[in-house]
Amino acid sequence: MKGLQDIEQFLALPQIAKWLAIATVAGVLCGTASAALLASLEWATNWRESHLWIIALLPLGGLLSGLIYHYIGKSVEAGNNLLLEEIHNPKQTIPFRMAPLVLLGTVMTHFFGGSAGREGTALQMGASLADQLTKVLHLKGSDRRILLMTGISGGFASVFGTPLAGAVFGLEVLAIGKIRYDGLFSCMVAAIVGDYVTLKWGIHHTDYRLASIPSMSLENFSGGSASLLSAVFAGAVFGLVALLFAETTHRIGHIFKSRISYPPLRPMIGGAMIAIAVWAVGTTKYIGLGIPTIVDAFHIQLPPWDFAAKLAFTALTLGAGFKGGEVTPLFYIGATLGNALSLILPLPTSLLAGMGFVGVFGSAANTPLASIIMAIELFGLPAGAFAGISCVVSYLFSGHAGIYRAQRIGLSKYPRVFVEEGVSLATFPSHRQQPEFDLFSDIDSLGFVEMENGKPKRCLTALRLYFHYGARVHGKTGWRKLTAPPLNWHLPHLAKEFGIQQAVLHRVQMGYLRGNDLNHDHHEVTPHQLPQCLELIDHEAKLREFVKVYSADLRQVRIVLIRGEDLPHEDLHLHQD
């Protein structure tokens, strides 16, 4: 009979209680911060539109923003990329000053007339405020990662009024093709609480309505197939434009950094260019958040070039170093692009605007599930099918690129494009591999041989960790012992987070450790003393570093190091029949 300590549901209760409390506090912080941000942006936008002469001072605003970050905020200047990098490779608590600095910088951008959004600001405020709980609660390792994800979800949900999409966004944005479910509960709680708190502060979100939604039923083959093909075509266009936005923004940023050595001068020069451009086009519809134009895209026909103009203004603003988010401009670009596509596609204007609204955002952020859920939250369930098709297609067409350079590639978007797992978007081009077609001439396609410069490497090492099935992470207090995870779950996760190339937990039928009694798995109740073997494959230096870093977690583990080499192709003697 199982003991109480072995019942999974019982073990889950302390974790649920723990993260319910932490995520609620994080949600309150995120909701309050987002309310302050939204109220500040509304004031800045109204003041700017009533005093258009302030746009002429955009270079001055850029210089001030650049000076503040250069002398006070250097450690947090990376913004969202710092958050993602800290989740993947935790080093130190996000400085508290990230929150007030990004709030001030974003308000200055909108006050003086830059084109930016608010999502990046909300994410940075939410995550940095939530991360301050790390010091109070002494959170480490995976708990701190979950806390940062919780702050991201709370910030996203509260600033856009989409709690379900916000919860999924915090899980999905970390890596392309993979979702971290370990933070699902806390992200969901923080998203719901954050949205609720923002509303309680008296903040109201924009209401988007779709005029009509046609049927995609294939029972009416001509009408249904036309709608389906239109959604696919629109999704492809949305993905390509999202790719263009991401690459243009990064390219402009690279040009400014390579040509202007003193960072504060970059937003000053960029601000001068934007101010001149606003004067040249004779309208302010392409700066700021652009909410009125987004709303118009659902109801009236707009000039077909609006999306391109907003793309250019936003890419220049963010590339020059102004602070603010990318997502609301992506909403603008997508909605106006969908509006333009209604001139050639047999779908309602409002529906295409809604599809573009979420499609361009989802593909630029590489978060298709969050964007689909957002469409359902904002536009209603009937829009889900069209949004789903366009978001998935746009995600595929945007390639391995995106607005977050620190985002990792967890799984290639295309079966015949092989990418090393864990590579960031910033380094993706140098890690792209050509697919192999001949299994017998090159078994590297199965991952058996690690290649370097076209030649097999012979320096891999196997680290075998032996422990009992019932062994758990060492805990000093009764509470720690009660909530400690089992080693057979904890150690593979540590290996994955540390970046170990390969980890395999072998299933053991029978055995014993260090002269203990012989135990066997009789498939009813697994004996606590049954041996477990976790085998890690990587370079010896990496494995030794793993043991050093996690020595406290390996107290009950017998460690065996086996030096070996990769077997090159010519030694395998494989012949095709």
Model region roles, listed by residue range:
Residues 436-577:
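Positively charged, small/polar-rich N-terminal and surface patches that mediate targeting and assembly
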Residues 1-437:
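Alpha-helical transmembrane segments and immediately membrane-proximal extracytoplasmic
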